[in-house]
A protein has these predicted regions:
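Radical SAM enzyme [4Fe-4S]-AdoMet core and its adjacent flexible, acidic
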Residues: 1-129
Length: 129
């Protein structure tokens, strides 16, 4: 998806940069990644969040930022990329995918908690962030 939406950006290079930011910056560094949610990628956001959490990052979007997942900004212009223009059947497919994803995220919520908060953040605090 990245290679299509953010051309000429290449996803493999983005992965390398995420790892550099996470591993080669000072301990006082916090990195926030935000995604422009739009018609072309809204279906894939659960995949992106799961990928991010499974990387074991220690500085990228750690709780409470994006609940340990990612931050979002919705695209409103141009109008044809606004998620509101999607057909109802596709919105239902997105809803189904998100609802299937939520239990995984809830079971793995601690993956987004930074090490200095481990044991200090309870599930309910995370859930309500």
């Amino acid at each position: 998806m990245n290679d299509y939406i953010r051309y000429p950006s290449e996803w493999k290079r983005n992965e390398e940069v995420f790892k550099i930011w996470d591993q080669q910056t000072g301990d006082n560094t916090e990195i926030t990644v935000a995604c422009a949610v739009q018609a072309l990628n809204v279906y894939y956001l659960p995949d992106f969040i799961k990928w991010k959490l499974e990387q074991g990052f220690t500085k990228i979007n750690m709780w409470p930022f994006g609940a340990g997942g990612i931050n979002y900004h919705f695209v409103y212009h141009p109008p044809h990329l606004n998620v509101k223009v999607l057909p109802k059947w596709f919105k239902e497919e997105c809803r189904k995918k998100y609802e299937e994803f939520y239990p995984w995220w809830e079971a793995n919520w601690e993956k987004g908690i930074p090490s200095w908060h481990k044991g200090k953040v309870e599930y309910d605090t995370w859930r309500n962030a």
